[in-house]
Structure formats: structure tokens, C-alpha cells
Amino acid sequence: MAAAPVFFPSSVVVSVYRAHGYAFSCSSLLSQLPAIKLSSYRPTRTDHTAITLLPNSNRIASRLQAMQSPTFEVNGDGKTEEVEKLQKGIAEFYDESSGIWEEIWGDHMHHGFYDPGTTVSLADHRTAQIRMIEEALRFASVSDDPMKKPKRIVDVGCGIGGSSRYFARKYDAECKGITLSPVQAKRAQALAVAEGLQGTVSFEVADALAQPFPHGQFDLVWSMESGEHMPDKEKFVRELVRVAAPGATIIIVTWCHRDLSPSEHSLKPQEQKLLNKICDSYYLPAWCSTADYVKILESLFLEDIKRADWSEYVAPFWPAVIRSALTWKGFTSLIRSGWKTIKGAMVMPLMIEGFKKDVIKFSVITCRKPE
């Protein structure tokens, strides 16, 4: 009789079976790995991976079980209560704050890319946000050649659709954007119609961890500053890879914490305390490092993996956001917007502190899905 499969979280399976070591310490299990047979990946409601245990491997099963994260109630859609609460907070935060952002900063809801040490005006900041898009495309070697340029693009965590509309014009491409915020999706679509792009750009409310698209649909998968909101980084990356067509480029621009040294198992307590304060106001789950992202990509056999720290190139951004909040227009808009936006404004100095102390890194990670 065939052994019954036992289900464990995918992150545990990858950590133990491939011995990458991120998030778990599993060196003591390496000598016993031959007793574990990894079955083909079969996603379930809770995104667990099946392991078929061979004879005399109960002890391994119990040790794997002990390595799991605390369990939570799983709802009918496969989400834990904790994830549902987080995503509800994210949606409400952006429902509340997107209007004030657009009014002051325009339709690109992300950092700008600046030459180090420069002094810039608000108009320069908007130019810098476009430059951020172009620099990320250049870093990933996305071609402008009419025969090679992307034709189908997904914007994961699209905000009010600034990147999507930019791509539609730049590449004459079909773009789809997803966001947790109904207010953002509605505004993004309205702007697309106003710009005559309704035939090529569309937006919807959807979960980046369970994207509403078939496998292999897009030849450019774009995530600009949305990864930091993802409670399961491995599942997030798996979804980016799943919807990518063979040969597609994947671009992740995101906030990370610094890489840990070989002797470290976690951030220092004062560093973690700083990040926790930011998480509370911006509805962020636990942070990861750029190295963590790279390990996930390597485990999925992605090609041409590249990474860079662009922290010095975004340094003028947060001081500029604070200055805009202290203008009369910014202050009155902030008060009208609501408590979640006010809380976010109050921790902006902590973002500056995190960058200055090298705890926070502004990271770009790119790769290509094999043909």
C-alpha cells in the first residue's frame, strides 16, 4: 500500500529539502533527507506541499512538524485570519490615502530615482519617479526593440495605475493591474479612460498571492513597491513566476531589511523594534532581506538573477514627502484623509532613520523565467 502524503507548508519543505536554510535552521536533518521523498507540487487551499514519508521516517515527520510556524484558523478562501486582517488594513490604508498622494505627488505611488547629493523640487520628484521606472527596466535589460519589447504586462500592486499606463504608451502593450484597494482600482480605470487607454489597460481588485490570471500569460511581470506588503514572500514570488510566460522578465522593486551576516540569525533587537513601528503604521508583515528573495528565486530555478541596493538613489524621497506634508495644502489634506494616513505620516521620519542606519534597503531584484 502506498504511503499517504503528509502536508507541510511549502516554505518548510523548500527549506528542509533544498537546504537553503532561509527562515529555518535544518542542518541537523540533512543526513536524514534520503528518507524523505518529495512528491510533485500540488497546491492546496493553504498552499501546502505533499511529502510522502517512507518507512521508519516518523521521527523526521515530527521534527518537520515542530519547525512549522504557529497555526491559524483558515477560512473558506484559504486565507488565515491574520492574513485577512492584514489585507483589510492595506486596502483601507490605500483607500484612504491614495487621493491625497495623487493630489500632491501625481499618479506614481513610489520612490523616485535621484543622483546622489542632488537638491530637487516637487517637479523634479515626479520626473524622478518616471526615472525609477526606466532605471528598473534598464537594470533588467528589457528591450525597446519592436520585435522584443513586452506586449503583455501585469502590474502587481498597481496603485492608481501610473506604471501600467506608462507601459501601455511606451510599449503599445496590453497591461493589467491588480490592487487590494477598490478606491485605487476605480481611480486607475478612470484615469485610463481619460487618457484613451481603456482598450489596452485594465485594473481590478485582486490578491497578489492568488492572481486571477492563467499560467504563463505575461512577458513582463512588474512589482513596484508591493512586495513589502506580502505576508508570504515565497508564495508571492511563486505567483509572479506562475503568471510569467516562458522567457518573461520579472522585476521586483521593494523595501527589504539589510542582509544578515553568516553569524547572525536575526536583526538586532533595536533594528527589529524600528521596523515593527513602521509595520504597524504601513500595514506591513515581517520584512525579509534581499538575499532571502534571491534564495527563493534560485530555488525556483529562475535565470539571470540580479540584485542591487538603490538606497542612495532614493535618499531625497522621504525628506521631500515630509516637506510636502508640512505645507498648508499637505497638512489640511492629511487631516481630512483620516487616521490611517495620519499614522503613516507620523512614522515617515523612521523610514529616514532606517535608511541612515542601513537597516532598510531599497532593493531591485530581476530575473528571467526559463524558456
From Swiss-Prot:
Gene Ontology biological process terms, A to Z: alkaloid metabolic process; methylation
Entry-linked InterPro entries: Methyltransf_11, MTs_g-TMT, SAM-dependent_MTases_sf
Cellular component, GO, one term: chloroplast inner membrane
Keyword Repressor on entry: no
Domain of life assignment: Eukaryota
Presence of keyword Metal-binding: no
Boundaries of the annotated transit peptide in chain numbering: 1-65
Region entry SAM motif II, spans: 216-224
GO molecular-function terms, A-Z: S-adenosylmethionine-dependent methyltransferase activity
Family listed: Belongs to the class I-like SAM-binding methyltransferase superfamily. gTMT family.
Subunit and partners: Homodimer.
Name of this protein: Gamma-tocopherol methyltransferase, chloroplastic
Gene: TMT3
